[in-house]
């Protein structure tokens, strides 16, 4: 599939700005990553609509404005090491890879990880490490992380992930019941404890333990 034309890209960036994605580095990263590469079949034609779309394993690719707002809230620096819990399509990880030194991404569905890895290779993104695993426990062998982003909803910010966050680090996670509107939370880890900011209402699939049946 060819990438978006100039008009489509301009409309896409305008829509992101109008929904609060205003940081230049985030917009540049999202402009550089073709969302269509992460979608299959008829859904690739809707890649530049600001809507969530279905992918394999009963999962979804989040709407671009939510991806942008979560990325913006994470405040990624060029030297950061980032953990993403929930690879999904790989779209979020690819954007993070444009901003961070190293991205580790984990998903419980082997098929999703394999398909995302193919796109990362196609895009020559050599700073992403993708693994199949139970993301609710993080990646302790690679910890600690400067930034952690969770793309599934937990009832509370997961303790194992907070333990893997560096002092001075930031975690962005949807918090709430899986069958209701959740709240996007930003957690800052300081020497004195944890600071929480409520950002906006969101809807995400639940964060589940264990591996997917397809793995």
Swiss-Prot record:
Record's subcellular location: Cytoplasm
Swiss-Prot/TrEMBL keywords: Cytoplasm, Methyltransferase, S-adenosyl-L-methionine, Transferase
Major location (coarse): cytoplasm
The EC number(s) this enzyme carries: 2.1.1.77
Active-site feature positions: 62
Protein's name according to its UniProt entry: Protein-L-isoaspartate O-methyltransferase
Alphabetical list of Gene3D superfamilies matching this protein: Vaccinia Virus protein VP39
Organism of this sequence: Ruegeria sp. (strain TM1040)
Reactions this protein catalyses: [protein]-L-isoaspartate + S-adenosyl-L-methionine = [protein]-L-isoaspartate alpha-methyl ester + S-adenosyl-L-homocysteine
């Amino acid at each position: 599939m060819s990438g978006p034309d100039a008009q489509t890209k301009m409309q896409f960036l305008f829509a992101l700005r109008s929904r609060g994605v205003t940081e230049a580095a985030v917009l540049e990263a999202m402009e550089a990553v073709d969302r269509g590469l992460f979608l299959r079949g008829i859904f690739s034609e809707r890649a530049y609509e600001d809507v969530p779309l279905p992918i394999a394993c009963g999962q979804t690719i989040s709407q671009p404005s939510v991806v942008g707002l979560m990325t913006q809230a994470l405040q990624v620096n060029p030297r950061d090491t980032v953990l993403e819990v929930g690879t999904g399509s790989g779209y979020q990880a690819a954007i993070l890879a444009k901003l961070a030194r190293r991205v580790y991404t984990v998903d419980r569905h082997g098929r999703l990880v394999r398909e995302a890895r193919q796109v990362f290779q196609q895009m020559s993104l050599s700073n992403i490490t993708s693994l199949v695993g139970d993301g609710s426990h993080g990646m302790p062998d690679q910890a600690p992380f400067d930034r952690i982003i969770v793309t599934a909803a937990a009832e509370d910010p997961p303790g194992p992930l907070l333990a893997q966050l560096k002092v001075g680090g930031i975690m962005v996670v949807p918090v709430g019941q899986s069958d209701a509107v959740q709240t996007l939370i930003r957690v800052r880890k300081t020497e004195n404890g944890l600071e929480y900011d409520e950002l906006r209402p969101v809807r995400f699939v639940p964060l589940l333990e264990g591996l997917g049946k397809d793995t």
